[in-house]
Each structure stands twice: as C-alpha cells, then as structure tokens.
C-alpha cells in the first residue's frame, strides 16, 4: 500500500515528508495506457499533488495543472486531504529516451508554461496560484511554486522508475522544509546534507526506498515520525454525476444524440471509465426536463 510518512527533526529545525506512490502511478499508467515519458510526467505530477494535499487541513480539494506548450500538452491532477488523487495527461503517447543511457526524458518535452494550483477549501472562494515552469521536470517547478507562492523554501525530489517493459517499477518522492526558528548553523547543516544526497532515482532503487529517503535526509540527526497515512489513486466519477451533466444540455442536443448516435458514451478523463446512455436513458432525461 502506498503511504506518506511525515517526520520532524528532533531539534525542530526542519521537517520532511517521504512517499511511496508506486501503486498510485502504476494504476494511473494502467488506466491511461501511457508510454514511458508520459508515465513519468504524469506520475511526478500525481506525487507533487499528494505532497501538496498532505500539507492542507480540513476537507480541501487541491488541483494541480502543469500546462506546457510542447509534446505533453497539459497534465491535470486533483487530490483531497484523505490521500486520494486522480489525474490525466493530454498526450499519453510520449516515449523518448536518451540513446546512451535509456533515461526517460521529461523536461525537454514540457516546453514553456505554468504550474497552476487551485486549493478549494469548500468556502466558495478557491485560492489560485500560477508560477512559471522553471525546468519542466515538475519537481523543480513544484519547489519554485512553494518558494514563490507559499513563501516556503523547500527541497523536492520526485521520480518514477520503469522496468525493462516500461511499466512502473517504483515511484515516490520527498519534501524537506526548514521550519521557523532554525538557526543559521542548522540551516547550513541541512543544506549541506541535501547537497550530498544521492539522486532521487538512486534512492528509489533501494530495497526499501522510504527508509533510504529518511536516512539520506536526516543522516545521524535524531528525528521522529509524526504520522503514516495511506495514499491511493481514486476517481470519484459516477454515472449520476455524468447524468447530471447531460441534464444541463438543451433538449435539442439530447434528441440529436438519440437520432444520430442512438445513445451517448461519456468517458471520464481522469480514469477512463466509460458510461453508456442508451436511447431510453436519454428519453428519460428529456422527459425529466419537461
């Protein structure tokens, strides 16, 4: 089961979140049938949103949009504060690797664009923030958002490793933040440790990558685990929700679906589930609108 572990240095100088998101990203790949680069880009976005959602309180809903002008198009993710996330990528078929190393490429195919967050607190006044994409690698873009919009300098690591068949092998990440009151000496020690950390891909390849991430972040510094919470890919779409959407259409449009298509099929963008509405279903909707 996927999870996020929240922890804090015993000194109170900084905190860290580490995530195992392997099942989340694997299910997203399965539902959207994404190729290598698209899988990694979508996976990183889902992990970023899992981190962002874990930082919220109450029943907030968090939307992350990574909008580029190159091959991927846009990537949309929606998460809640209960550990659920869903998402999709506009172009599922990007499959580009470095010839020499086989490394999956992401940044060069995101292009110029924006990292957009919408936090809905349920009050009717969602908070929206937009920052430019810095590298298109998503992790760096997320870190820039946290620094610029939330005024919280953060170290971020996100990645998805694929097997020889380009299926998700492991996915996860971390966030480290200095807390108010940290001394200059503590901040310097924290920065030095982060500079010396192995690459996120190396840590994820460890046998137990969650423990490997925590060890790399804290080193010999004492820390305590605050909580461990489950994470999952879960879509909240339903036939009733799409039926309500059809009810907003004019009668003429519903009648055209009956006359021309003998029904309607609606596909959820976030999870690919297909909902069929036959002629009788549409006629019932027309009668309900009468």
UniProtKB/Swiss-Prot annotation:
GO BP, sorted A to Z: protein refolding
Any GO MF annotation of the entry: protein folding chaperone
Subcellular location: Cytoplasm
Source superkingdom: Bacteria
Disulfide bond sites: 235-237, 268-271
Principal subcellular localisation of the protein: cytoplasm
Post-translational modification summary for this protein: Under oxidizing conditions two disulfide bonds are formed involving the reactive cysteines. Under reducing conditions zinc is bound to the reactive cysteines and the protein is inactive.
Annotated InterPro entries: Heat_shock_Hsp33 (IPR000397), Heat_shock_Hsp33_C (IPR016154), Heat_shock_Hsp33_N (IPR016153)
Alphabetic keyword roster: Chaperone, Cytoplasm, Disulfide bond, Redox-active center, Zinc
Keyword presence, Cytoplasm: yes
Pfam families noted in UniProt: HSP33
PANTHER family hit by this protein: 33 KDA CHAPERONIN
Family label: Belongs to the HSP33 family.
Function: Redox regulated molecular chaperone. Protects both thermally unfolding and oxidatively damaged proteins from irreversible aggregation. Plays an important role in the bacterial defense system toward oxidative stress.
Protein name from the UniProt record: 33 kDa chaperonin
Taxonomic lineage of the native organism: Bacteria, Bacillati, Bacillota, Bacilli, Lactobacillales
